[in-house]
Amino acid sequence: KAAPDLVKGVVALDPVTIDPSFLAFSRLAFRLWPERPQLIRGAIGRPHRFSDHGAAFNFYRGKRAFTDVSDKELMDYVLAAHVATSEGVELRFSGAWEACVYRSPPNLWRTLKTTKVPVHVLGGERSYVITPKVANRLRSIKQIDFRTLDAGHLLPMEKPQETAGFVINCLGQHSDSELS
């Protein structure tokens, strides 16, 4: 809103677009019981330090969220998300930070309806974030080009080539002069 002339379009990958009725409930629940939701407890309670990158990889490999992520992409994530310490490796961002992000879900609906630039959204067909109700609502907004991939919320790691192709195609819809 501060400098709309700097934005020619938006490309969003499985964005957190929560159904408004659930959004109101979740915001209230996070205020009343900030430590109770499973998502919060999981973020705070999971290990954040490992003896090495291999141990971190093995931990994530056993998690449902990473089931459809190839070994290569999972190791890329591990290497990017962890920093070496004198005791091994640790996540670059703490569980407390992750919990804070979960406690403050965005309400993008008004912005999506009033934006003046093209919005390209790629959602995962098996995503827990873009539910069928949310997908239908995204499809109903005229300036949104909504597409899906057979993937979950981690679609850039599950389908990296297809995701990159979507982004490149979206960027290619604007001339070089528009993007500079």
Segments (PLM) and residue ranges:
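Conserved hydrolase catalytic core segment
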Residues: 1-25
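Conserved loop-alpha-helix segment in the C-terminal half of the alpha/beta-hydrolase fold
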Residues: 109-151
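Catalytic histidine-centered segment of alpha/beta-hydrolase-like enzymes
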Residues: 151-164
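Alpha-helical membrane-targeting segments
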Residues: 17-37, 41-42
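Active-site loop signature of alpha/beta-hydrolase-fold enzymes
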Residues: 18, 129, 154
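Short aromatic-enriched loop/helix-cap "lid" or pocket-rim segments at secondary-structure transitions
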Residues: 21-26, 133-135, 160
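C-terminal alpha-helix
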Residues: 166-174
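Alpha/beta-hydrolase
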Residues: 43, 47-120
